[in-house]
Amino acid sequence: VMNMWPGVKLRVTEGWDEDGNHFEDSLHYEGRAVDITTSDRDRNKYGMLARLAVEAGF
């Protein structure tokens, strides 16, 4: 993220769900999922953010 968008940070908004905010079969209940965004919350970056996550092995 820092190489793609200088000054923008990765934000983890949720990793483990205890409150039941996700679908019943969500991997959040097993601690195997994460919700992420960027510090500037620019939705136009989300497609590239997903590609970067896949390239990093997530």
Swiss-Prot record:
Binding, Ca(2+) 1? 13-14
Q: Which domain of life is it from?
A: Eukaryota
InterPro entries on file: Hedgehog (IPR001657), Hedgehog_sig/DD-Pept_Zn-bd_sf (IPR009045), Hedgehog_Signaling (IPR050387), Hedgehog_signalling_dom (IPR000320)
Compartmental location: Cell membrane; Secreted, Extracellular space
Task: Indicate whether Cell membrane appears among the record's keywords.
Answer: yes
PTM comment, free text: The C-terminal domain displays an autoproteolysis activity and a cholesterol transferase activity. Both activities result in the cleavage of the full-length protein and covalent attachment of a cholesterol moiety to the C-terminal of the newly generated N-terminal fragment (N-product). This covalent modification appears to play an essential role in restricting the spatial distribution of the protein activity to the cell surface. The N-product is the active species in both local and long-range signaling, whereas the C-product has no signaling activity.
Q: GO terms for molecular function, please?
A: calcium ion binding; patched binding; peptidase activity
Cellular component terms (Gene Ontology)? extracellular space; plasma membrane
The Gene Ontology biological process annotation of the record reads: cell fate specification; cell-cell signaling; proteolysis; regulation of gene expression; smoothened signaling pathway
Q: What does the entry list as the binding residues for Zn(2+)?
A: 28, 35
Summarize where Ca(2+) 2 binds, as residue positions: 14, 17, 19
- Keywords for the protein's UniProt record, in alphabetical order: Autocatalytic cleavage, Calcium, Cell membrane, Developmental protein, Hydrolase, Membrane, Metal-binding, Protease, Secreted, Zinc
What does this gene product do? Intercellular signal essential for a variety of patterning events during development.
What's the entry's take on its domains? The desert hedgehog protein N-product binds calcium and zinc ions; this stabilizes the protein fold and is essential for protein-protein interactions mediated by this domain.
| UniProt family annotation | Belongs to the hedgehog family.
User: What is the name of the protein in this document?
Assistant: Desert hedgehog protein
| UniProt lineage | Eukaryota, Metazoa, Chordata, Craniata, Vertebrata
The gene designation is dhh
